[in-house]
Amino acid sequence: MKIAEIRELSTKELLERVDAEVAAYDQKKINHSISPMDNPSQIKQQRRLIARMKTELRQRELNNK
């Protein structure tokens, strides 16, 4: 998901997506520890996507004050 797509989401949608992505990230980490993934860089990509979403949420929070 690109930053432009993240910015188009409403705050409520963004919060829901962050929760879903964190759950998916945790599940990938658990699965990877049990049996190695074919593409372990997916974990890194997921972590960075979560960071982008949280950064956008924080920017919105600061702009509203």
UniProtKB/Swiss-Prot annotation:
Record's GO cellular component terms: ribonucleoprotein complex; ribosome
Alphabetized UniProt keyword annotations: Ribonucleoprotein, Ribosomal protein
Gene Ontology biological process terms, A to Z: translation
A molecular function GO annotation: structural constituent of ribosome
Superkingdom of the organism of origin: Bacteria
Pfam families per the UniProt record, alphabetical: Ribosomal_L29
Keyword check for Lipoprotein: no
HAMAP family registered for this protein in UniProt: Ribosomal_uL29
Family classification: Belongs to the universal ribosomal protein uL29 family.
Name used for this protein in its record: Large ribosomal subunit protein uL29
Native species: Parabacteroides distasonis (strain ATCC 8503 / DSM 20701 / CIP 104284 / JCM 5825 / NCTC 11152)
Chain's gene name: rpmC
